A protein has these predicted regions:
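HEAT-repeat alpha-solenoid elements in large eukaryotic scaffold proteins
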Residues: 18-29, 55-79, 89-96, 104-120, ...
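Fungal intrinsically disordered, low-complexity serine/threonine- and proline-rich regulatory regions
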Residues: 1-44
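Alpha-solenoid ARM/HEAT helical repeat scaffolds used for protein-protein interactions
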Residues: 81-83, 122-127, 164-169, 209-213, ...
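Glycine-rich flexible loop motifs, especially short His-Gly-Gly/GGXG/HXGH segments used as catalytic or interaction
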Residues: 290, 335-339
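Conserved tryptophan-centered aromatic signature that marks the ligand-binding surface of SH3
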Residues: 296-304
């Protein structure tokens, strides 16, 4: 029986969505209103729609993708003055994502990234930030299959446009951006390792800067680390690259040497950066390490055991004052399961963590 107005029964719907950050998506009706703003904008929207209609996914060779992208790029130039939102943005993003299919040659990928860069260049930063969720799904997997000629263009798109946005626009996309950049630092000997690592570190500072607190400072990168831990937990294929970043940038959770007694370690003995990394959910750090210790690749297990020994010893205040008992059981069980590998290098690191220095 449906509820009647005034029958005294309360609705089970929540009063709010509980979001900590605002919903930044631009409604479709806003884009439609922009498209109908004036004659120039309507003509611009018609040209884009005509270029999109020339895309036929059922009967295309790779050369046809190049021709389609050239037509789309021609339709995008020049944009009308004071353009706020790109007309038919969702359709454009869909076609660009299809042009970034791993089965297509690198020439198509380069052309598609050029179109992304063109769109991002003439959209105002607030508008790009509000519509970033439309374009990002096509960009996220690029580094996992990109050739050496495509990677610099991808890095330029991230550096020149996305990382220039305010932190309030980058925060909702932080985890996706982390996952998109981790393949670039999997091989520490690759020629683009330094650039990918630098971009990821800039993302750490940009996304973690408090919106109202001014410049970045120590202890304000907790939001980035929480997203990073989630990325490691949910994406086994990205853990090799994540390990390279953790080895260089993870805060040390070892108690201060000046503490009077290691059995009475207080919160203040943790550095500010370490306190930020476990706020508001210290269990994410534990589950991140547990996921790495149970990875199918022995090199990943070895790397996370090294991090346990150097950054997260058993006498750390994290285990004593922050995590729950079931989280402690989880990471101990995950570490102990490494002996099933019957690998001496893993066993040696495990005993170092259990027995201490």
């Amino acid at each position: 029986m449906p509820f009647e107005p005034g029958d005294g029964r309360r609705s089970v719907s929540p009063l709010s969505t509980g979001r900590a950050s605002p919903a930044l998506r631009a409604p479709r009706r806003v884009e439609d209103a922009v498209a109908q703003k004036d004659k120039t904008t309507r003509r611009y929207a018609t040209a884009i729609d005509r270029a999109l209609s020339s895309f036929d996914s059922a009967q295309q060779e790779w050369a046809d993708y190049i021709a389609f992208l050239a037509r789309l790029l021609k339709a995008l130039h020049p944009p009308p003055p004071a353009l706020e939102y790109l007309p038919h943005a969702q359709s454009v993003a869909l076609r660009l994502a299809q042009c970034l299919n791993p089965a297509l040659p690198s020439g198509v990928h380069q052309k598609a990234l050029d179109v992304y860069a063109t769109i991002f260049s003439f959209l105002p930063p607030p508008s790009l930030g509000q519509t970033l969720h439309v374009y990002l799904p096509g960009l996220v997997p690029v580094l996992s299959f990109a050739s050496l000629s495509v990677r610099p263009i991808f890095y330029s798109v991230i550096e020149d446009h996305i990382l220039k946005l305010d932190s309030e626009h980058i925060r909702p996309a932080t985890k996706s951006l982390i996952l998109s950049l981790l393949p670039g630092i999997e091989d520490e000997t690759s020629e683009d390792f330094d650039r990918a690592f630098r971009i990821l570190n800039v993302l750490r500072k940009t996304s973690s800067r408090d919106i109202d607190d001014g410049p970045d400072a120590e202890g304000r990168d907790g939001y980035f680390w929480q997203c990073f831990f989630l990325a490691v937990i949910t994406n086994p294929s990205r853990r090799q690259g994540a390990l390279a970043f953790l080895t260089r940038k993870l805060p040390n959770f070892t108690p201060s040497e000046t503490s009077p007694d290691s059995s009475q370690v207080e919160d203040r003995t943790l550095p500010l950066a370490a306190q930020a990394a476990i706020n508001p959910e210290p269990g994410l750090l534990v589950r991140c390490f547990a996921a790495g210790l149970q990875d199918s690749q022995i090199l990943v297990q070895r790397g996370f055991l090294d991090l346990l020994v150097t950054h997260l010893p058993l006498h750390s205040p994290v285990f004593r004052n922050h995590v729950r008992s079931k989280d402690m059981v989880l990471i101990t069980t995950a570490a102990a399961s490494c002996v099933l590998r019957r690998d001496m290098s893993l066993n040696r690191r495990l005993w170092s963590w259990f027995l201490g220095p």
